[in-house]
C-alpha cells in the first residue's frame, strides 16, 4: 500500500515473515500484487543478537507473475564479516523462483530452496484426502486425572493408556501415562469442552509429539490409547491400518517435505494432513514398517517403563554374564536390522518421488539408537539393580 504502481519497496525484516503461518495472508497479498526482484536471507547474527533477518526488493507490478526473482542464502555463516565476504564473492547458494510458485505450498511459505521436482508434488493427493484429525482430549487438571502407568494397578478399568508426546522415538513407544477414564471423569472433561469425539475411541492411529527441538517422529497409536493435544493423532477415514504413511512420514523424504510444510518447532495436524502423498511399492513398504514396529516394540518392552514389561533381560541366562552377552547380541541385531530397513525405506521413497540427488538415503545412527537401543553396560546394570 505504501508503494506506487511500478514502484520498488526495499526492506530488512525478521526472517519469520517468509515462513510463519500467521503471516500467510500477507504473503498471499504480495504474491497477488508484486514480484520479488532480489532477496538476501541473512540468517542469524547479521545485526548482533537478532532472530534472523531477510533483505528484499519487491516491485509493485501484477503483469509479470512468472518473473523469477533471485534468492541468496547467507545463513550458514555466523559473523557479519563472513556474511559480507560470502555475499561479495557471489559464491553463496542462489535460487530462482517466481512468487506465484509459492501458492502451491501450504501457508504460501516462501520456501525458496525447494526444487522444481519437489514443487511438482504439492497441491495434489494430499494426506487429508484419506486421513482425518482425531481432535484431542484435555483433562483441564492433569495433576488429578493423569498418572504414570506404574502408579496404578494394571487391572483397573478406570485408567487407560494416554499419549502425551515425548522424546524423539520412531515407530513405537513413549507409553508412560494413563488417564482417568471413569464416567465421572469423562463428564468433567466434556463439561469443559475437553472430551475427544467418541467415534475415535478404540481405533488404531498415527501419532507424534507436537513439539520437538529435533525432528518429528511418528509412532503407532494402539486402539486402547487416548491422546492429548501434545500428542496429535490422525486416522484413516475408514479407520483401517495404513503403515505406508507411517513409513513415508518417518523417512528422509518425509522429513524433507515436513520441513517445507512446518517452519516451527511444533508440527500440527493441519500441516501433516497437507503432506503430498505418492504411493508406490505399497506392500513392500508395509512389510518393512511392520517389522520396524515389532523391533521397536521389543526394545520398548525390554525396559521397566513399558506397561508390557515382564522380566529384566539380565535374568534370562544361567549367569548374569551370559544373560548380558545374549542381551548385547539381541540389541545389536535389532539396531542393525532397523537401520537397514530405514535406509531401504529412504531409497524407496526417494525413487518414488524422484528426489535423487536432493534427498540422502543415509540413516543417522543416533536416530536409530533412539528407537532401538544398543546394550549399555552401565545403564543396564543400574536398571538391573533398580529392578531387583
Predicted feature locations:
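Non-catalytic DNA-recognition/assembly elements of restriction-modification systems
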Residues: 107-115, 119-122, 141-142, 276-388
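Long, contiguous hydrophobic alpha-helical segments, chiefly transmembrane helices and signal peptides
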Residues: 39, 55, 146, 179-181, ...
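DNA target-recognition domains and sequence-specific DNA-contacting regions of bacterial/archaeal
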Residues: 136-223, 232-237, 360-388
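Signature of N6-adenine DNA methyltransferases within the class I
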Residues: 1-155, 174, 184-194, 203, ...
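N-proximal short alpha-helices
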Residues: 214, 218, 257-258, 318-322, ...
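Short secondary-structure junctions and interdomain/linker hinges
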Residues: 37, 125-133, 152-157, 166-170, ...
Amino acid at each position: 500500500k505504501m508503494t506506487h504502481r511500478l514502484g520498488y519497496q526495499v526492506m530488512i525484516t525478521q526472517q519469520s515473515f517468509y515462513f510463519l503461518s500467521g503471516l500467510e495472508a500477507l504473503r498471499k497479498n504480495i504474491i497477488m500484487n508484486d514480484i520479488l526482484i532480489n532477496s538476501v536471507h541473512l540468517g542469524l547474527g547479521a545485526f548482533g543478537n537478532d532472530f534472523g533477518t531477510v533483505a528484499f526488493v519487491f516491485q509493485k507490478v501484477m503483469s509479470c507473475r512468472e518473473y523469477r526473482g533471485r534468492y541468496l542464502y547467507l545463513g550458514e555463516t555466523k559473523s557479519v564479516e563472513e556474511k559480507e565476504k560470502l555475499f561479495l564473492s557471489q559464491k553463496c547458494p542462489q535460487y530462482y523462483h517466481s512468487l506465484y510458485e509459492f501458492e502451491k505450498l501450504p501457508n504460501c511459505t516462501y520456501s525458496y530452496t525447494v526444487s522444481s521436482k519437489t514443487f511438482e508434488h504439492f497441491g495434489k493427493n494430499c494426506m487429508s484426502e484419506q486421513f482425518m484429525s482425531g481432535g484431542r482430549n484435555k483433562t483441564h487438571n492433569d495433576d488429578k486425572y493423569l498418572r504414570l502407568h506404574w502408579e496404578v494397578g494394571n487391572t483397573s478399568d478406570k485408567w487407560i493408556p494416554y499419549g502425551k508426546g515425548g522424546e524423539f522415538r520412531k515407530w513405537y513407544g513413549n507409553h508412560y501415562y494413563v488417564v482417568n477414564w471413569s464416567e465421572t471423569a469423562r463428564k468433567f472433561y466434556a463439561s469443559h469442552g475437553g472430551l475427544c469425539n467418541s467415534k475415535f475411541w478404540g481405533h488404531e492411529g498415527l501419532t507424534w509429539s507436537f513439539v520437538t527441538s529435533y525432528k518429528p517422529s511418528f509412532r503407532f497409536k494402539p486402539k486402547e490409547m487416548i491422546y492429548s493435544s501434545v500428542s496429535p493423532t490422525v486416522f484413516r477415514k475408514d479407520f483401517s491400518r495404513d503403515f505406508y504413511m507411517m513409513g513415508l512420514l518417518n523417512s528422509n523424504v518425509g522429513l524433507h517435505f515436513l520441513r517445507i510444510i512446518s517452519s516451527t518447532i511444533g508440527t500440527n495436524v493441519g500441516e501433516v494432513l497437507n503432506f503430498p502423498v505418492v504411493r508406490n511399492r505399497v506392500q513392500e513398504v508395509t512389510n518393512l514398517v511392520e517389522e520396524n514396529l515389532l523391533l521397536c516394540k521389543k526394545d520398548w518392552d525390554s525396559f521397566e517403563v513399558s506397561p508390557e514389561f515382564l522380566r529384566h533381560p539380565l535374568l534370562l541366562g544361567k549367569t548374569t554374564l551370559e544373560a548380558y552377552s545374549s542381551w548385547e547380541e539381541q540389541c545389536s541385531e535389532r539396531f542393525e536390522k532397523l537401520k537397514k530397513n530405514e535406509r531401504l525405506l529412504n531409497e524407496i521413497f526417494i525413487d518414488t518421488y524422484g528426489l535423487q540427488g536432493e534427498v540422502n538415503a543415509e540413516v543417522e545412527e543416533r536416530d536409530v539408537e533412539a528407537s532401538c537401543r544398543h546394550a549399555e553396560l552401565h545403564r543396564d546394570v543400574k536398571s538391573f539393580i533398580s529392578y531387583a
